[in-house]
Amino acid sequence: MKYQFPENFWWGSAASGPQTEGVFEGDGKGQNIWDFWYQEAPEKFFQQVGPDKTSQFYKKYQEDIQLMKETGHNSFRTSIQWSRLIPDPTTGKVNQTAVDFYNQVIDDLLEHGKRPLDLYYLLVLNL
C-alpha cells in the first residue's frame, strides 16, 4: 500500500509549556499544580523528573526552532503556561516577561516559515 500525503499536510511537532519550558528564577512565573505536586512528592514522578528538569524550551526555543527547520517541520503546537502569564490569579496581573516570551516565540516561528498553533489549556492550573 502506498500513500501520498497532501502537499499542504502539516508536518510538525508539539510541546506542553509545563513539560518543556522549565522553571527559572526571576522570570515572574507563579506556581502551578505540577510545581506544587513535585515539591510535595517527587517520588511520584518517573525517575523524579519534574519541572526543574525539562528541555528548557524557555531558554533554548531558538535552537529548537532551528531544529524544526532542519527536519522539515512546517508547524509547531505549544501551550501557554498560565502560571507564567498570570502568576497570581487573585490579582489577574499579567507578567510582561511572559507576554514578551510568547510573542517572540510566535514571531520566530513565523520568521522561519512555521505555523504556530497555540493550545490555551493542557491540564495545568495556577495555585
Predicted regions and their residues:
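Substrate-binding cleft and catalytic face of glycoside hydrolase catalytic domains
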Residues: I65-L127
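N-terminal carbohydrate-binding accessory modules
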Residues: M1-H73
